[in-house]
């Protein structure tokens, strides 16, 4: 069966009509795309103009194409409960969230400042501990917190950041300003899914993506890759990503990120220590690891120093 396209002479769709009416009548408190009077916000104007040229059948076909790409790419999310595990497709929001450059620059500046604060606080907890000694934070915040790893005290006096990656969940508050809903600093995931989402969305709206001045994601990953190899320096050996393994819900992302960044993907059972150096088992014998980027919860990384029941770490 042939699909209908915008070149078939069909009238422009009116999918936004009833939606805009709800906004105009106050049925919704706020909206990213439409102003309270139902007009399209400037950042969305070109996308909405493009969207309205597509028939409902064409939109359905394009949405299905984006979903099919994710299935073909093997983008899955694993779910677990006490008795079984299951896989489900990674949910793709077919309509992207669009914001102008000035709004994103404001958000970005705030998140960078927040990340720098988190880095300062975390480093202080494991070095001088001035926040506790000065009384700004209660001592029990650390001493009774199972996430505080005592063996790490004094080991963070290097120049490298403790937080190599950090993620934030954000949302727009009632006043219209963006709020941070949660800080994700313990092996934050979904960066790989962001790439796949972008690729899928670009296939859904290829005409729009080719003409719009969209901020690219590649720069972030290039900078992060360079950071990892800068930390490695001239040391002999591989840069590896340590994953909990196949049963982890984010394992598909770990494989994608490792391949995208040119890293060796390893699990705890792949690693050994020889003469005080981390090594990875290969068919050609043990090879040195110069830098290990862990995607494990920190207490699970070292069963000798942290959680003795862990079978995931090195």
Regions found by a protein language model. Give the residues of each.
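Preference for protein termini
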Residues: 1-314
């Amino acid at each position: 069966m042939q699909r209908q396209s915008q070149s078939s002479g069909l009238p422009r769709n009116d999918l936004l009509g009833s939606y805009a009416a709800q906004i105009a009548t106050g049925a919704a408190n706020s909206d990213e795309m439409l102003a309270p009077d139902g007009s399209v916000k400037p950042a969305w104007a070109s996308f909405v103009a493009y969207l309205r040229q597509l028939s409902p059948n064409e939109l359905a076909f394009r949405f299905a194409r984006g979903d099919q790409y994710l299935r073909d790419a093997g983008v899955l999310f694993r779910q677990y409960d006490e008795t079984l595990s299951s896989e489900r497709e990674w949910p793709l929001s077919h309509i992207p969230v669009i914001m102008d450059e000035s709004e994103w620059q404001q958000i970005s500046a705030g998140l960078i400042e927040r990340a720098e604060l988190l880095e300062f606080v975390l480093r202080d907890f494991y070095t001088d501990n001035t926040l506790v000694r000065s009384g700004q934070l209660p001592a029990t915040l650390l001493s009774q917190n199972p996430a505080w790893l005592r063996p790490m005290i004094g080991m963070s006096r290097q120049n490298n950041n403790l937080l190599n990656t950090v993620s934030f969940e954000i949302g727009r508050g009632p006043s219209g300003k963006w709020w941070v809903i949660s800080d994700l600093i313990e092996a934050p995931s979904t960066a790989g899914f962001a790439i796949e989402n972008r690729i899928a969305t670009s296939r859904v709206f290829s005409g729009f993506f080719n003409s719009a001045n969209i901020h690219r994601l590649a720069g972030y990953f290039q900078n992060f890759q360079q950071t990892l190899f800068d930390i490695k320096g001239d040391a002999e050996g591989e840069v590896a990503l340590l994953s909990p393994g196949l049963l982890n819900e984010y394992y598909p992302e770990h494989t994608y990120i490792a391949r995208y960044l040119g890293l060796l993907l390893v699990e705890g059972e792949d690693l050994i220590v020889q003469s005080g150096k981390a090594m990875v088992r290969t068919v050609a014998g043990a090879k040195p690891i110069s830098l290990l980027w862990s995607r494990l919860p920190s207490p699970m990384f070292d069963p000798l120093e942290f959680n003795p029941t862990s079978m995931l770490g090195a």
